[in-house]
Amino acid sequence: MNDTLVRATAANGGIRLVAAITTNALKEAKSRHKLSYLTSALMGRAMSASLLLASSMKVLHGRVTLKIQSDGPIKGLTVDACRDGSVRGFLGNPSLELDLVKSKEGHHCFDFANATGKGYLHVIRDIGEGDPYSSTVELVGGGIGEDIASYLLHSEQTPSAVFVGEKIKHKELVCSGGLIAQILPKASQDRSLAELLEENCNTITSFSERLFEYKDNLSGLLKDLFYNLNPEIVKGPSARQEIKYRCKCSRDRSISALKLLGNSEIKSILNEDKKAEITCEFCKNVYQIEEEELRSLVDI
């Protein structure tokens, strides 16, 4: 099944719900970047979270960028997601693998805290005009979900529950995705609604398992998890959004990037290598710029 994002409301429009499946996008990222199990999980969570955030943007070309800058061995993570469902990302140390740790419930899980270490999550929202809106929060746990919830609370003053997860079965990635539940401004003063939503979210103890169970039926997932809040899928074309791992790089953009180096640096490349090779960080596509093209970029 294709990766999909589904939008819904609950509690008579007082709560916004969005769920996403990103399994295929993560498999594409895993293949392109040669990700380990640990970094696959982190990448999948970051892609899911960024798509959930981008889903609320009013313009189709709106973009959300998540960046983790920290002292952990993952050596940084960057993910771009657009309102149109496209997503891409890269990590500083894609082959990183750490021993599993035990959760509070006694389950073995990935050691996200030590992978990311101490640092910050940067969230950049860009609608394509004016200056992008940027906000930074300290990492809470490194597993992405808590970190995004912290960002939404402190930077956007929006109480939110964020769930992200993945399922690996027989050493194969079989499911990745996420869910966000937010109380909308018109219901923000309703304490009973906030308490009811919190109660619901506290019962979700194994999101990855529930996601795997409903991976082909996100509507069913929302109706199951929030059954007492009467969730309703949004009507119209905005109800569902296809998700794809898609990069915006191109040969022309690579040449434009070379121009920024300036005449002196390009001449140095010509003298030493006669050509340039540019690799896109996001998708690993390689662009070969031959000598004749390089010479056309400078005044010799």
UniProtKB/Swiss-Prot annotation:
Belongs to the HSP33 family. Under oxidizing conditions two disulfide bonds are formed involving the reactive cysteines. Under reducing conditions zinc is bound to the reactive cysteines and the protein is inactive. The lineage of its organism: Bacteria, Bacillati, Cyanobacteriota, Cyanophyceae, Synechococcales. Pfam families: HSP33. The keyword Heme does not apply. HAMAP family: HslO (MF_00117). One of its GO terms (cellular component) is cytoplasm. The keyword Cytoplasm applies. Keywords: Chaperone, Cytoplasm, Disulfide bond, Redox-active center, Zinc. It comes from Prochlorococcus marinus (strain MIT 9211). The gene is hslO. It is found in: Cytoplasm. GO terms for molecular function: protein folding chaperone; unfolded protein binding. NCBIfam families: PRK00114.1. One of its GO terms (biological process) is protein refolding. Disulfide bonds join C247-C249, C280-C283. InterPro entries: Heat_shock_Hsp33, Heat_shock_Hsp33_C, Heat_shock_Hsp33_N. This is 33 kDa chaperonin. Its main location: cytoplasm. Redox regulated molecular chaperone. Protects both thermally unfolding and oxidatively damaged proteins from irreversible aggregation. Plays an important role in the bacterial defense system toward oxidative stress. It comes from the Bacteria.
